């Protein structure tokens, strides 16, 4: 089967790799986003998909706006591909492109459709505290993730999973599911299922303001935000930004999901039942563990943080390095 692959980030690499390892498929070309400039050094950096394609001597096309790039459109048409495979490409494909391949354009989407259509399904799924997510393959149409569904695969989400953890798992699942989907499409063993638009939810592009932590929210809500938008959630500490990259909401309801090393750590904590403070206030510090902050509902353990210009560090190293004291308040420009 002749394939053209459209994809850009690390999430798309395992699917391309699975196609390249399978002799049933011939990847004719790879379409990816233009190289981007890094913040540091201002160097142009190729996408992970481009790196993989170059390593396998594949033609790579990087149109700025594929809808209006006549040269790319002509080259795609001339390839006469059986299917286009699209995994987190980052541009909307025109109907002209969608109509080119014989079997259609197959998209690998990081959610259980019709839930979490859109640009950031994994992040918003974690933000909302979902306990399961998955991959859906679908035949693309002109809408945003509205095409008929082909196959689905699910995976559980643990309370300590962050967006990177889930993305890595789903990227592998997606590669396997895509191969199965293409086989069954070719053999006409799949009946595409239209999505129920009434049941659809949307995962919009994440904005900078989504990273700000509001300490009046509950410990569980803040924890879900921190792991969903990992590693970018930010508060303030002594009038400078502080990223919180890992946390844990304290309470018996969550303890069953703890790995042994975290269970041992929490056994060092004092009785917290009588401790309280204002939202964002550091209410307890335990040697070898770190700081605990009051939230609008419940207490939040700061497991890992990152100061400006520094590497991420454990909660306890943060306490030691800054000489943090009980009573200091996070947020509110403090």
UniProtKB/Swiss-Prot annotation:
GO MF term (any one): methionyl-tRNA formyltransferase activity
Entry similarity comment: Belongs to the Fmt family.
NCBIfam families on file: fmt
Residues given in the record as (6S)-5,6,7,8-tetrahydrofolate binding sites: 111-114
Main function: Attaches a formyl group to the free amino group of methionyl-tRNA(fMet). The formyl group appears to play a dual role in the initiator identity of N-formylmethionyl-tRNA by promoting its recognition by IF2 and preventing the misappropriation of this tRNA by the elongation apparatus.
Catalyzed reactions: L-methionyl-tRNA(fMet) + (6R)-10-formyltetrahydrofolate = N-formyl-L-methionyl-tRNA(fMet) + (6S)-5,6,7,8-tetrahydrofolate + H(+)
EC number: 2.1.2.9
Keyword Transferase: yes
Gene Ontology cellular-component annotations: cytosol
A Pfam family assignment: Formyl_trans_C
Entry annotated with the keyword Plastid: no
Native species: Trichormus variabilis (strain ATCC 29413 / PCC 7937)
Protein name per Swiss-Prot or TrEMBL: Methionyl-tRNA formyltransferase
TM region positions: none
Keywords for the protein's UniProt record, in alphabetical order: Protein biosynthesis, Transferase
């Amino acid at each position: 089967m002749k394939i053209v692959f459209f994809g850009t980030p690390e999430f798309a690499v395992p699917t391309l790799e699975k196609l390249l390892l399978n002799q049933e498929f011939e990847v004719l070309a790879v379409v990816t986003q233009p190289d981007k400039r890094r913040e540091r050094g201002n160097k142009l950096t190729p996408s992970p998909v481009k790196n993989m394609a170059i390593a396998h001597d594949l033609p790579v096309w990087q149109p700025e706006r594929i809808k209006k790039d006549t040269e790319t459109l002509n080259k795609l048409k001339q390839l006469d591909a059986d299917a286009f495979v699209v995994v987190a490409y980052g541009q909307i494909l025109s109907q002209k492109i969608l109509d080119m391949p014989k079997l259609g354009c197959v998209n690998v989407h990081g959610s259980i459709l019709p839930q979490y259509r859109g640009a950031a399904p994994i992040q918003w799924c974690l933000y909302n505290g979902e306990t399961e997510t998955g991959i859906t393959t679908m035949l693309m149409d002109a809408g945003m993730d509205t095409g008929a569904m082909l196959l689905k695969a699910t995976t559980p989400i643990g309370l300590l999973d962050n967006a990177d953890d889930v993305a890595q798992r789903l990227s592998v699942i997606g590669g396997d599911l895509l191969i199965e989907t293409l086989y069954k499409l070719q053999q006409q063993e799949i009946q595409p299922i239209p999505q129920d638009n009434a049941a659809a939810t949307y995962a919009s592009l994440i904005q900078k303001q989504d990273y700000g932590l509001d300490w009046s929210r509950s410990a569980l809500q803040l924890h879900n935000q921190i792991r969903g938008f990992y590693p970018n959630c930010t508060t303030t500490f002594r009038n400078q930004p502080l990223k919180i990259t890992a946390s844990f909401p304290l309470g018996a309801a969550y303890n069953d999901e703890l790995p042994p090393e975290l269970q041992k750590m929490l056994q060092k904590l004092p009785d917290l039942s009588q401790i309280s403070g204002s939202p964002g206030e550091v209410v307890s510090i335990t040697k070898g563990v770190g700081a605990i902050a009051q939230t609008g509902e419940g207490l939040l353990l700061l497991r890992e943080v990152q100061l400006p210009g520094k590497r991420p560090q454990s909660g306890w190293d943060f306490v030691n390095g800054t000489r943090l004291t009980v009573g200091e308040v996070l947020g509110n420009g403090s």
